[in-house]
Amino acid sequence: MSSEVAARRDAKKLVRSPSGLRMVPEHRAYGSPFGLEEPPWVPDKECPRCMQCDTKFDFLTRKHHCRRCGKCFCDKCCGQKVALRRMCFVDPVRQCAGCAPVSRREADFYDRQLKLLLSGATFLVTFENSEKPDTMVCRLSSNQRFLLLDGDGDGDGHREVEVARIAAVQMLTEGLPPGDTLSHTSLPASRPAAEGGNARAIGMTLQYTTPGAEGLTQLTLTAGEDADGSRRQATAWLAAMHKAAKLLYESRDQ
């Protein structure tokens, strides 16, 4: 991909919506796969009362729409302004008591885990037709749309997996039976293995579609056994990718 094409795909623009200022991709098709669309607002005529506490709206009690769910509430039930990066808002926006905690938890992904994914980690990567694994660095592209795998020159060299084409993710753990399987219709209730409990993430299997090919392609990432910090970095990257997969499926289910 030429630098000119890449720049055009990564271009962004500032837009003003009823909810606030948003920095969105110039071309909608090139948006982050983790993003959410703005919800339609419940029409004013359909909500004469707060949808949380049932207080009637009047001249003194104004109605406000939650920017995340689009429902209308009184100021007491929708007075928190919280960052909502999945909708590309520039500033914190008004959210209801139910949505605000969700957005705060997602902020941890953008503040901590996304940085891990962008930095990358070293894995033993096994492709479905490979006889032996290749040592490769796996990282998320800056536009969040691709997983980039770069080898040491002895194997396939460079591979790209489009995040939006990932169909299933299976976490490989040690300390408990085989890990959770994520799919478009089934999400695990457990936390990522590296974030708590006795299990520890040691790898991940990805299944994804490839343009022009039938069925699913599969690859497996496994953290190496070396004693230095690269294994720790790899397990942290796996936990971050586990969270990213959950956000990906939520975006699809919107």
From Swiss-Prot:
A Pfam match: ZFYVE21_C
Protein name: Zinc finger FYVE domain-containing protein 21
Signal peptide annotation: none
Oligomeric form and interacting partners: Interacts with PTK2/FAK1.
Span list, region PH-like: 107-254
Annotated InterPro entries: FYVE-type_Zinc_Finger (IPR052113), ZFYVE21_C (IPR032031), ZFYVE21_C_sf (IPR038632), Znf_FYVE (IPR000306), Znf_FYVE-rel (IPR017455), Znf_FYVE_PHD (IPR011011), Znf_RING/FYVE/PHD (IPR013083)
Keywords: Cell junction, Cytoplasmic vesicle, Endosome, Metal-binding, Zinc, Zinc-finger
One term of GO molecular function: zinc ion binding
PANTHER family cross-referenced by the UniProt entry: ARRESTIN DOMAIN-CONTAINING PROTEIN D (PTHR39490), ZINC FINGER FYVE DOMAIN-CONTAINING PROTEIN 21 (PTHR39490:SF8)
GO cellular component, one term: focal adhesion
PROSITE patterns given in the database record: ZF_FYVE
Binding site for Zn(2+) 2: 66, 69, 96, 99
Domain notes: The FYVE-type zinc finger mediates interaction with PTK2/FAK1, and also interaction with PI(3)P and association with endosomes. The C-terminal region exhibits a structure similar to canonical PH domains, but lacks a positively charged interface to bind phosphatidylinositol phosphate.
Task performed by this protein: Plays a role in cell adhesion, and thereby in cell motility which requires repeated formation and disassembly of focal adhesions. Regulates microtubule-induced PTK2/FAK1 dephosphorylation, an event important for focal adhesion disassembly, as well as integrin beta-1/ITGB1 cell surface expression.
Compartments reported by the entry: Cell junction, Focal adhesion; Cytoplasmic vesicle; Endosome
Binding-site positions, Zn(2+) 1: 50, 53, 74, 77
Originating organism: Bos taurus
ZnF region ranges: FYVE-type: 44-104
